Amino acid sequence: MDADWATRYGRPVRLPSRPSHTVTRLKQAGADAHQLLQSLPSHRRAPRAEALRQIMVQNFLVDARGVLRSRTEKDGRPKGAVRVISPYDPDARQAIRGNTRWNGYLVHVTETCDADARVNLITDIVTTSPIRDAQALPGIHTRLARRGLLPTEHLVDGGYTSMVHLERAEREHQVTVNGPLPGNPTRRHRQHEGFDRDDFHIDFDRRQVTCPRGQVSSSWHGLYPTSSPTAAPLIVAKFTKGQCQPCPDRSRCTTSRESARNVGFPPRELRDLQARVRTEQQTPDWKARYTVRSEVEGTINEFTHGHGMRHCLLPRASS
């Protein structure tokens, strides 16, 4: 540090008079922060110094010439789940839900919805970082179990319906989680063209898959973990080039000219659960029960517009 630091950072805000001043000050701030971090032992950095290090990694890099410069989109940026958005609140993250974006946290509200009850009672409310909604389910059920308030059926919106967490809720807490399951994300399924995974017959006992043309897979591999915390691990069945290349329906099955078709699918217990849930969700009884879930939207609306939930600071609880 030198005497010029007091001039540069003694005031909380210094508005630039010219656009070029912003770039100049950004470079100077990056150089100063880099110098400061270089002078601190890496094993003795306090939380604020660690937050500064993260912010520097997000916004600057040292190139091949050893020169510190601003990071661009081409250089890559950390994902929103780990990116620090404010030095004043290093736990806050950017959240995206549909067309809505904000910086901060998520609030998860659970309430009773008994048909014969005169009022609905809030049984759990928690503030988390903007994780996927399904990741909040285990913590919600753990807290409800601790209070003796676990329901037999938990109605949720589509953001909470991960097959992994639905199975876990049944296994660990005997809670049936009901909500719209996400559809098949593959291009073939969306465009209703070609053969997608559901067109293949899976025989778990024989560890083989049969394609719509009657060819049987040559190998069975997995389980393979996925990068998403809400996605199920996958088994992958593979066909050979000798099976796929002569097939008259090849263009409907794979877009690759060289390789053969692979089929990925979840383990038996998750696939059976998925099939059962999707069948149940087509019944009038399930649809009638699920309409009750919309009542919690009124509670969230009251929190938002009546109590300033989107602007007040809430205590955060770990799931």
Where are these regions (language model features)?
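Anion-binding and metal-coordination hotspots
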Residues: 1-319
